[in-house]
């Protein structure tokens, strides 16, 4: 267990609004497209602080923030196994959405990335 912890939160204020559906949830309304305003909290731990007395240098997290924005900022998140995946790409070709594929969608699956 780490001795020092630090957290970084990317909240609703940076515009992480995405839409997705659960293609395997044919028993509920979750198989329909629905949108979320997303937020992410990352916790970092270390046994020894760096020379600035930090557990993590937040300045080094710019690539993480960019990945979050590229993946979730007004994006249509599609499960790679969604049987209707091509239809989302048809919408993207018409400039009606921006598709990002994931190996599973939902809060739990997004946390795995």
Residue ranges and their predicted role:
Residues 1-113:
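Charge-rich, low-complexity N-terminal segments
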């Amino acid at each position: 267990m780490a001795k020092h912890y630090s957290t970084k939160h990317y909240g609703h204020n940076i515009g992480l609004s995405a839409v997705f559906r659960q293609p395997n949830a044919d028993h509920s309304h979750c198989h329909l497209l629905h949108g979320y305003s997303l937020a992410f909290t990352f916790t970092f731990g270390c046994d020894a602080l760096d020379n600035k007395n930090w557990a993590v240098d937040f300045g080094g997290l710019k690539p993480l923030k960019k990945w979050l924005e590229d993946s979730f900022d007004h994006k249509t998140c599609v499960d790679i196994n969604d049987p209707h995946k091509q239809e989302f790409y048809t919408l993207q070709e018409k400039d009606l959405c921006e598709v990002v594929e994931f190996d599973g969608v939902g809060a739990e699956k997004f946390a795995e990335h």
